[in-house]
From Swiss-Prot:
Description of how the protein assembles with itself and partners: Part of the 30S ribosomal subunit. Contacts proteins S9 and S11.
Single Gene Ontology MF annotation: tRNA binding
Alphabetized UniProt keyword annotations: Ribonucleoprotein, Ribosomal protein, RNA-binding, rRNA-binding, tRNA-binding
Biological function: One of the primary rRNA binding proteins, it binds directly to 16S rRNA where it nucleates assembly of the head domain of the 30S subunit. Is located at the subunit interface close to the decoding center, probably blocks exit of the E-site tRNA.
Name assigned to this protein: Small ribosomal subunit protein uS7
Organism taxonomic ancestry: Bacteria, Pseudomonadati, Pseudomonadota, Betaproteobacteria, Burkholderiales
Pfam families per UniProt: Ribosomal_S7 (PF00177)
One GO term of the biological process aspect: translation
Amino acid sequence: MPRRREVPKREILPDPKFGDVDLAKFMNVIMQGGKKAVAERIIYGALDFIEKKNPGKDPLEAFHMAIGNIKPMVEVKSRRVGGANYQVPVEVRPVRRMALAMRWLKEAAKKRGEKSMSLRLANELMEATEGRGGAMKKRDEVHRMAEANKAFSHFRF
């Protein structure tokens, strides 16, 4: 391992409209090629659509609820022991938990069939708040893998 000091985490500024750090982080995940204005338009469009569909319900609350539902608790990591590779279930650190949830949400929204990305994202977010959708399927798949390989949990890292 390198003996240099640990690089400090960069502070992410909250997003301009809602003042939320997690939303700003998700904006950076959605952004492609440094086009933050496009990412902003996609996310704010999705949140506006959620507000139209569910009047009186806070879209930011729906976003946080969806992310909370998608976050994985455990995942599997490959570990080589005596010439065999084992899928060892490990607990996911909180920062990685958030990153995986955002990445899965983006990928699931991309794969949907709606016309615009903001519409896809809005529908994926609404489904995730109800516990269904592509991102939730991905989380359940990861949890199933960890459950199936519970026998190898004594090979901790």
